[in-house]
């Protein structure tokens, strides 16, 4: 004997009504799940009981399904891409009112008496918000700008190595991150000093000199003398072929461009002004490879290069002096950090001689043979 067919009518008994609600609700959820799996669709079931409690079942995301229910008609959902392998695109915003049950009415008249779908004139057409290629291309320049390396600025300053250690230098004062230079032990070439060219003629910039001699406490160290020397270029206005001085002068620059830069020679000590016959410069002959072509300038126009020659008389009026290699053996090197101590005329002869002796021992121009 089969099951008794229940008449479709409201149930008055509360207990029977609650049992029927639970059983039929689970059966409805089961049918919705089977439909979603078999037909590859999205099914959402919303049930509100007599007491106002909400019961929800959805085969996928419930919020996304409700948003599609508010924005799309029935046959617009058929043309969506969720029937393919790609997932359905979500809308930009989800209204919080979708969970309260404020839904728009659907055009489902064809479900009542028609098996065939509606015609195109009966359907609400609209453009699907598919992702276009132009939207993706708009982000490509921004991504490439982030991945592109930044170029170096024109104000980039090249760093220079410190003054090289000497034989009587303390072993703990040697910088551990600077390997010894191959030209440090060669007396014919100076260490790679760093010279900075001025911005304009006549500018005054500080020059620093590190001397590898014992400091005031008796221990080996660097004694730094800072002085200001004016840069003056008398040949720049008359000689257009003179190249601009680079911001640094290393050993490799000196070896490559020995015929490029002009030379002016070292400044005499202060005691030379009172007794010039005591000093004689030797072993500085033309073409001597021991004198690389440094570029120095004249700080005082009244002091001419002929002051170093003892046999010549009083100073000659100032003119422009230049030379390559060691042609100007009798010239004075001005604007160098080596004779910064002898610029004060208040020094005694003994102090000036001792200072000039220290300078001659470290000069890159082989001034170790200076006699007094």
UniProtKB/Swiss-Prot annotation:
Skewed-composition ranges (Polar residues): 114-145
Biased amino acid composition, Low complexity: 84-100
UniProt-annotated location(s): Nucleus
Span list, region Disordered: 81-187
Residues covered by the MADS-box domain: 1-61
GO annotation, cellular component aspect: chromatin; cytosol; nuclear envelope; nucleus
Compositionally skewed regions (Basic residues) per UniProt: 167-184
Function field: Acts in transcription regulation. May bind to a MEF2-like typee II promoter sequence.
A biological process from GO: positive regulation of transcription by RNA polymerase II
Source organism of this protein record: Schizosaccharomyces pombe (strain 972 / ATCC 24843)
UniProt keyword terms in alphabetical order: DNA-binding, Nucleus, Transcription, Transcription regulation
Protein name, UniProt field: MADS-box transcription factor pvg4
GO MF, one annotated term: RNA polymerase II cis-regulatory region sequence-specific DNA binding
Principal place of residence: nucleus
Pfam families xrefs: SRF-TF
CDD domains, A to Z: MADS_SRF_like
InterPro entries (alphabetical): MADS-box/MEF2_TF, SRF-like_MADS-box, TF_MADSbox, TF_MADSbox_sf
């Amino acid at each position: 004997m089969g099951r008794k067919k229940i008449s479709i009518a409201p149930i008055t008994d509360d207990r029977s009504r609650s049992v029927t609600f639970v059983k039929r609700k689970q059966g409805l959820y089961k049918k919705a799940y089977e439909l979603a799996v078999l037909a590859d669709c999205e099914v959402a079931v919303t049930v509100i009981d007599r007491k106002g409690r909400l019961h929800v079942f959805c085969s996928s995301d419930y919020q996304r399904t409700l948003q599609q229910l508010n924005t799309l008609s029935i046959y617009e959902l058929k043309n969506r891409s969720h029937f393919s392998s790609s997932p359905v695109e979500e809308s930009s915003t989800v209204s919080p009112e979708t969970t309260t049950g404020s839904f728009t009415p659907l055009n489902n008249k064809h479900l009542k008496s028609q098996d065939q779908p509606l015609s195109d004139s009966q359907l609400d057409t609209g453009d699907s918000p598919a992702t276009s290629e132009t939207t993706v291309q708009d982000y490509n320049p921004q991504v490439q700008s982030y991945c592109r390396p930044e170029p170096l600025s024109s104000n980039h300053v090249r760093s220079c190595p410190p003054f090289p250690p000497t034989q009587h230098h303390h072993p703990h004062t040697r910088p551990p991150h600077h390997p010894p230079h191959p030209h440090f032990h060669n007396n014919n070439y100076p260490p790679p000093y760093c010279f900075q060219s001025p911005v304009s003629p006549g500018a005054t910039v500080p020059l620093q000199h590190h001397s590898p001699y014992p400091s005031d406490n008796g221990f080996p160290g660097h004694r730094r003398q800072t002085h200001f020397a004016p840069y003056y270029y008398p040949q720049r206005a008359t000689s257009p072929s003179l190249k601009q001085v680079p911001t640094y002068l290393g050993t490799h620059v000196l070896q490559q461009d020995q015929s490029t830069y002009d030379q002016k020679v070292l400044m005499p000590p202060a005691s030379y002004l009172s007794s010039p016959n005591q000093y004689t410069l030797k072993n500085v002959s033309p073409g001597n490879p021991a004198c690389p072509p440094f570029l120095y300038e004249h700080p005082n126009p009244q002091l001419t290069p002929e002051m170093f020659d003892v046999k010549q008389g009083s100073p000659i009026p100032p003119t422009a002096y230049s030379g390559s290699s060691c042609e100007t053996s009798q010239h004075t090197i001005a604007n160098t950090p080596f004779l910064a101590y002898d610029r004060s005329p208040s020094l005694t002869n003994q102090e000036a001689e001792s200072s000039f002796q220290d300078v001659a021992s470290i000069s890159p121009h082989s001034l170790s043979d200076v006699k007094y």
